A protein has these predicted regions:
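Terminal low-complexity tails and localization/encapsulation signals of metabolic enzymes
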Residues: 1-63, 94-98, 127-134, 141-173, ...
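Glycine-rich loop-to-alpha-helix module at the N-terminal edge of alpha/beta enzyme cores
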Residues: 56-145
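Conserved small-residue-rich beta-alpha loop and adjacent elements
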Residues: 146-221
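Generic beta-strand/beta-sheet core signal
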Residues: 172, 192-195, 199-201, 228-230, ...
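Periplasmic-binding protein-like
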Residues: 187, 247-251
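Hydrophobic/aromatic ligand-binding patch that stacks against planar heteroaromatic rings
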Residues: 187-190, 238, 263
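Short acidic active-site motifs
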Residues: 157, 234-235
Length: 307
C-alpha cells in the first residue's frame, strides 16, 4: 500500500509544518531523493515527488515520481553501459564485493532507516541488512563461476552451451523486504553482465534510494544500475512495452503481473513474473541458480569433428 500523497515540486517552498527551532535545536531538513540514472542523481521529468511516511505518520523524506520519459532515459543509460557485459566475471565480482563491503560499513544506518520506514524492530531490520550484505558477497563469488557446459551429440561432434547476459533487464522489486528483495534481484542480474533499471518497493523506497551514495563509492560503472522510484505497476508496464528492454522481472500483484506479460508479448520480451509470497531471507528461495538462469540466455555452438 502506498503511503503519502503525490505533490509537484519545481522549486523549494516553505514547509507548512515549519517552526522556529528552540535554542540549541537544529531546524528540520527537507530531504527529497531524486532518481539514479546513468550514475548520477537526476530530477524526475515532471518534477513530482511523493511523501514517504513512517507508520506513526511522521514525514521521513520525499522521493521522486518517475514517469515514462524517466524510464526511457534509464534505458538509454543502461544501453550506454553495454561494456559491462564484456567485463570479465572476475572484475564484475570485485565490484560486487566492494559494494558489499561499503554497504557493511553503513549497516547500522540502513537498519535504522528500514526500521523507521516499516515499523519493524531494530533487530529484524538489522538481520535484513546483514542478509543483503551476505547476498552481495554470494553473487560476487558467482560472477566468474556460472559457466556453460559441453555436451556430446549423437553425431561426431560436441556442443558448447555458453551462458550470456540478457542485456538490459527491467526489474520491479517486491514490497516485502525492501532492501533484501532489491539486492536479491539486482545482484544476480549484474553479476552475469546485465545492466538494469530497477523500480524499488513503492511503499518503502528509501532502502533503495539510500544506496545511491553506496553505488557512487563502489566503482559501479555509470548506467549499470539505474533506479527509478514511483508507481511500480505503471512503470513496470512501460518497461514491458519498451522495445530496447530485453527482459522484465516483476514481483507484485497478480493483476499487474498479467498486464506486464501482455505488454511484453508485442516485442517477444522474456518475462519473469511472480505474485506469490517469497521468503527472501531463506537462501533456498531468495538466491541461487534460478536467479542466474533468469539473468542469462544460452548460446549453443556445434563443433563437428572427424575420425
Amino acid at each position: 500500500m502506498e503511503r503519502g500523497t503525490r505533490n509537484k515540486r519545481r522549486a523549494p517552498v516553505p514547509r507548512s509544518d515549519f517552526r522556529v527551532p528552540r535554542s540549541g535545536e537544529l531546524p528540520p531538513i527537507d530531504r527529497t531523493y531524486k532518481l539514479f540514472i546513468g550514475g548520477t542523481q537526476a530530477r524526475p521529468d515532471e518534477g513530482y515527488s511523493r511523501k514517504i511516511l513512517a507508520p506513526s505518520g511522521a514525514l521521513l523524506a520525499e522521493v521522486a515520481e518517475g514517469n515514462r520519459k524517466d524510464i526511457r532515459n534509464a534505458v538509454e543509460a543502461a544501453h550506454a553501459a553495454e561494456g559491462w557485459a564484456k567485463t570479465s566475471g572476475h572484475n564484475r565480482g570485485q565490484v560486487l564485493y566492494y559494494l558489499a563491503e561499503n554497504l557493511a560499513q553503513r549497516a547500522d544506518e540502513f537498519a535504522e532507516r528500514i526500521s523507521g520506514m516499516t515499523g519493524r524492530d531494530a533487530g529484524d531490520a538489522r538481520r535484513e541488512v546483514d542478509a543483503s550484505i551476505a547476498r552481495l558477497f554470494s553473487y560476487a563469488a558467482w560472477a566468474d563461476k556460472y559457466d556453460g557446459a559441453v555436451h556430446q551429440t549423437p553425431i561426431r561432434g560436441v556442443t558448447l552451451a555458453m551462458n550470456e547476459p540478457m542485456g538490459v533487464i527491467g526489474i520491479a522489486c517486491p514490497e516485502a523486504a525492501p532492501l533484501l528483495g532489491f539486492v536479491s534481484l539486482v545482484g544476480p542480474a549484474v553479476a552475469v553482465g546485465n545492466t538494469v533499471i530497477a523500480i524499488p518497493s513503492e511503499a518503502h523506497p528509501l532502502a533503495a534510494t539510500e544506496l545511491y551514495t553506496v553505488l557512487d563509492s563502489s566503482d559501479v560503472p555509470a548506467g549499470v544500475i539505474n533506479i527509478v522510484t514511483g508507481a511500480k505497476d505503471a512503470l513496470a508496464k512501460v518497461l514491458a512495452e519498451h522495445d530496447d528492454v530485453d527482459a522484465v522481472w516483476y514481483f507484485g500483484s497478480q493483476t499487474a503481473g498479467a498486464e506486464v506479460e501482455r505488454a511484453s508479448a508485442g516485442n517477444m520480451k522474456r518475462t519473469w513474473v511472480e505474485w506469490h509470497a517469497r521468503d527472501w531471507a531463506d537462501s533456498r528461495h531468495g538466491e541461487g541458480r534460478e536467479f542466474l538462469r533468469e539473468a542469462t540466455q544460452v548460446k549453443n555452438i556445434w563443433i563437428p569433428y572427424g575420425e
